[in-house]
A protein has these predicted regions:
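Enzymes that bind and transform nitrogen-containing heteroaromatic metabolites
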Residues: 1-192
Length: 192
């Protein structure tokens, strides 16, 4: 059985976002995220996707949203070719689930939109699948994650998006990196 993995960064008071932005700037942590997820599948909610402004390069991007057509309409710069592929017609949700859409032949940016977690099957992908936000997506998918890679930012910050409780479900496997500003920890799900 194949499981998801989660990757996140949170402050001491569990904040992961403020105004749809990351409330700290830690280039070393961004590099860790990039190295870890490169070549993998990344799953994110609509708000997380919109905060990035574009698909993450060299990864397959899966976006969870209850309103896929709205997302497509709001981002014609990203999904323009996607609409063209469907002949400009408004497809039924299940019609565009089965395959990835290559957005640019020169870059390996693949993107898929999911309207339901039920449609997200980790067995469908050969690559590792990382859950990377936001708060609602973590809340729903952490129980299905075998591993959690968590950056703990060693300060409290103001925010409006919080990482869910995970401590009762996960056990610390190893501390990957420890700096004065943050630490990166690998947790394993006790029940998977």
């Amino acid at each position: 059985v194949k499981y998801f993995k989660a990757i996140a960064a949170m402050s001491l008071n569990r904040v992961i976002g403020a105004g749809n932005r990351i409330p700290w700037h830690l280039p070393e942590d961004f590099q860790w995220f990039k190295r870890t997820t490169l070549g993998s599948v990344v799953v994110m909610g609509r708000k997380t996707f919109e905060s990035l402004g574009k698909p993450l390069p060299n990864r397959k991007n899966l976006i969870l949203t209850r309103h896929p057509q709205q997302l497509i309409r709001q981002h014609p710069d990203i999904f323009g070719q996607y609409r063209e592929w469907r002949g400009g017609k408004a497809p039924k949700e299940h019609q565009y689930q089965p395959r990835f859409i290559r957005l640019d032949g020169n870059r390996n940016e693949d993107i898929r939109i999911f309207s339901s977690l039920k449609l997200l099957d980790p067995e469908e992908f050969a690559d590792q699948i990382f859950i990377c936000g936001g708060a609602q997506v973590y809340e729903q998918l952490l129980p299905r994650c075998s591993d959690l890679y968590l950056t703990l930012v060693k300060r409290e910050v103001e925010g409006d998006a919080f990482f869910p409780e995970f401590e009762s479900r996960f056990v610390l496997e190893e501390e990957i990196r420890d700096t004065p500003e943050f630490s990166i920890r690998h947790y394993r799900n006790k029940s998977l």
